[in-house]
Amino acid sequence: MNKQSWLLNLSLLKTHPAFRAVFLARFISIVSLGLLGVAVPVQIQMMTHSTWQVGLSVTLTGGAMFVGLMVGGVLADRYERKKVILLARGTCGIGFIGLCLNALLPEPSLLAIYLLGLWDGFFASLGVTALLAATPALVGRENLMQAGAITMLTVRLGSVISPMIGGLLLATGGVAWNYGLAAAGTFITLLPLLSLPALPPPPQPREHPLKSLLAGFRFLLASPLVGGIALLGGLLTMASAVRVLYPALADNWQMSAAQIGFLYAAIPLGAAIGALTSGKLAHSARPGLLMLLSTLGSFLAIGLFGLMPMWILGVVCLALFGWLSAVSSLLQYTMLQTQTPEAMLGRINGLWTAQNVTGDAIGAALLGGLGAMMTPVASASASGFGLLIIGVLLLLVLVELRRFRQTPPQVTASDS
């Protein structure tokens, strides 16, 4: 990576064929999951006319994802990781086929949608954990920042494209097309993933899966560095739940339906800019301090967001949050991979991802509770400034993370 450039270097896709295969598979997978994400709530709403039933499907899938992340972490540290990834993807695709066949029935089964949602949520997260644990072996630990930034861009781009395609398919062909193409896309991802090298876990003594998972918890709690990173990640995810207040704040700002879209687009746009301008992050001598400060800045942006007199200024605050949270997330990802022993990578990645999932749910619940007692403006500000106070305390308490220093990676000729 060129020291003189702030821009992200994409050369990793050229120099590392295995990472290129993962990049391609991940992009196709994100688009496929996006088609599914549009179709499931629409189908349930059409069948039941109940937002509660739609919410139940999201909750069940989220619960299955949490369990899948826990189980996937243990499996990724115990079995050959490539096999775990392929098994999870293939099994997930079978669930999508089930959703497609159910949608083609004269009277689709609501119970089948719920059960297949549990199936897909579990196996999708199983593969995610194994892939995260395998990444250092695919790109080398010195390239993790670059790999994380490219991955973030992939996720953001796919998240923008897939709902648009999903909406067009719903308008022209119905939900069965969404499910069918999601299944096809998932099986297509197996082709590039088959080219991956063998990814065996490091040798370690066999133990009961629950005991193995508890060992991961103990490592997380015993390590001030890794535990602090995970804690910051959870708080940052809680802050992103501010999106539940967008409709109410839009009324406060008297925004049109078209303008509300800017609120939802602001954070992904800011995050994409953060990933694109992450060229120098890997060369930071004090990544822990930078992570803490960028996290504090993101909380401040949320606190100021609801106080803005004009919606356009609120959008700027959200974009700033997206940028700062991207910086913090990239540093979290890189430090977590480099500071975790190889034998623990599956479990720690599973726990880190799981706390992100639960952080979002907790943040949404807290904001919903605040919204019942306060105005939307007060709720947004209270959440942002409350997290800012907690962040300042963590800045003082997490001494090892704050003082952590690293030797910046050497610049190679291919990076210049």
Curated annotation (Swiss-Prot):
Membrane-side (Cytoplasmic) residue stretches: 1-21, 77-83, 131-156, 200-218, 278-287, 337-356, 400-416
Gene3D superfamilies: MFS general substrate transporter like domains
InterPro entries documented for this protein: Enterobactin_exp_EntS, MFS_dom, MFS_trans_sf, TM_effector
Localization terms from the record: Cell inner membrane
Superkingdom classification of source: Bacteria
Pfam families recorded: MFS_3 (PF05977)
Transmembrane segments: 22-42, 56-76, 84-104, 110-130, 157-177, 179-199, 219-239, 257-277, 288-307, 314-336, 357-377, 379-399
Keywords noted in UniProt: Cell inner membrane, Cell membrane, Membrane, Transmembrane, Transmembrane helix, Transport
GO cellular component: a single term: plasma membrane
Single GO MF descriptor: enterobactin transmembrane transporter activity
Membrane topology (Periplasmic): 43-55, 105-109, 178, 240-256, 308-313, 378
CDD domains noted in UniProt: MFS_MefA_like
Lipid bilayer topology: Multi-pass membrane protein
UniProt function note: Component of an export pathway for enterobactin.
UniProt family annotation: Belongs to the major facilitator superfamily. EntS (TC 2.A.1.38) family.
Protein name: Enterobactin exporter EntS
